[in-house]
Amino acid sequence: STKDEVIVGGSPTFALWAELSEWNLSPGTVTLWDQGYSNLFPDLNFEIAAHLLTRVISKPNKNLLCLDLGHKSVAAENPLEKRVYFPEIETYKIISQSEEHLVIECPESDKFEIGQHLIGYPQHICPTVALHSKANLIINNNITSKSWEVTSRNRV
């Protein structure tokens, strides 16, 4: 006789279903935990595992930084203030985003140089990861030459 396979659980219910070893889990976000679930489920105690590397490409005005993090790089389905979080910037407001650029208002903009790299945590990793063909791996806080192919990018 064939035993039926039960596939359960998304990321929010991962902790509940993880204890039921006879069932297969199907969470996606636990692999690349994002800012959104970090805010919604702090009790799950996962670290944010999806980081976006961006850089300051210009300073178009006083207190403004223009980053190369447009909606070709980070999912744009959320309101501006809920698309990406910058842990290295104490106070900022996202004021616009286009295909290629994201502009933030930042009172501490003098601290940042053109060309400087910044890390952004995506609010929602699922549509963000599909924008990229691979994910580079950071292991023990070191950037490596290893990467994962993002198969959702080119599926038929």
Task: Label the model's feature ranges.
Residues 1-156:
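Active-site anion/phosphate-binding pocket segments in diverse small-molecule metabolic enzymes
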